[in-house]
Amino acid sequence: MKFFIFILALQQLYVQSFAQDFDFFYFVLQWPGAYCDSRHSCCYPQTGKPAADFGIHGLWPNYKTGGWPQNCNPDSRFDDLRVSDLMSDLQREWPTLSCPSNDGMKFWTHEWEKHGTCAESELDQHDYFEAGLKLKQKANLLHALTNAGIKPDDKFYEMKDIENTIKQVVGFAPGIECNKDSSHNSQLYQIYLCVDTSASKFINCPVMPHGRCDSRVQFPKF
């Protein structure tokens, strides 16, 4: 029994030796219409076209200084068996539009190995992906924006209205990133919400991400 406890303690120390201290998470949601509009092509997942909703891009540990850790534990590989109960939710809420069409495994592997391994002191692999899913449900941004009259209909909206609507929902100002379509229109692309190290509560952003947006931005259809 003592030997078993000793082994568990060694395993915990091993994880901690790779896990990096961090100050908060960026929880990043991506609008698929803007992703596809800014590229020559985008490919739907093998499960079909995702819903016209914000998809999770990632849950990224960050420092208050503006930097971030990455690839913290090369021995901690993504294992789909550990998230098998979340798979249908991941396919729906955390999809990829990269080409060629795929099942999402490569994307989730990248997110875990680059970002998730740097939060292992707080979240194991299952908890990490489950936290992202819960945060998306908690924010429910498309519902909030639509209720405020801000819809993905190719129309242009005031950035301040988008920011204020999101702030009312999560309680804190978001970071917003825009990109440009083929006509060089500034369009709503990614929304950054700051989250505490337990990945359970939205917080005030210690540092805002850099994202250039015009005062009026397009909310493209998908």
From Swiss-Prot:
CDD domains in the cross-refs: RNase_T2_euk
Q: What PROSITE patterns does this protein map onto?
A: RNASE_T2_1, RNASE_T2_2
Q: Which Pfam families has this protein been placed in?
A: Ribonuclease_T2
One GO MF term? ribonuclease T2 activity
Disulfide bridges in this chain: 36-42, 72-118, 178-213, 194-205
Class of this enzyme: lyase
Active-site residues are 57, 111, 115
Swiss-Prot/TrEMBL catalytic activity: a ribonucleotidyl-ribonucleotide-RNA + H2O = a 3'-end 3'-phospho-ribonucleotide-RNA + a 5'-end dephospho-ribonucleoside-RNA + H(+)
Q: Which residues bind RNA?
A: 30, 57, 107, 110-111, 114-115
Report the EC number(s), separated by commas if there are several. 4.6.1.19
Q: What's in the keyword line of the UniProt record?
A: Disulfide bond, Endonuclease, Hydrolase, Lyase, Nuclease, Signal
Q: Which residues form the signal peptide?
A: 1-19
Under the heading InterPro entries, the entry gives: Ribonuclease_T2_eukaryotic (IPR033697), RNase_T2-like (IPR001568), RNase_T2-like_sf (IPR036430), RNase_T2_His_AS_1 (IPR018188), RNase_T2_His_AS_2 (IPR033130)
**What family does the database annotate?**
Belongs to the RNase T2 family.
* Biological function: May remobilize phosphate, particularly when cells senesce or when phosphate becomes limiting.
Database matches in PANTHER family? RIBONUCLEASE 3, RIBONUCLEASE T2
**What name does the UniProt record give this protein?**
Ribonuclease 3
Organism in which the protein naturally occurs: Arabidopsis thaliana (Mouse-ear cress)
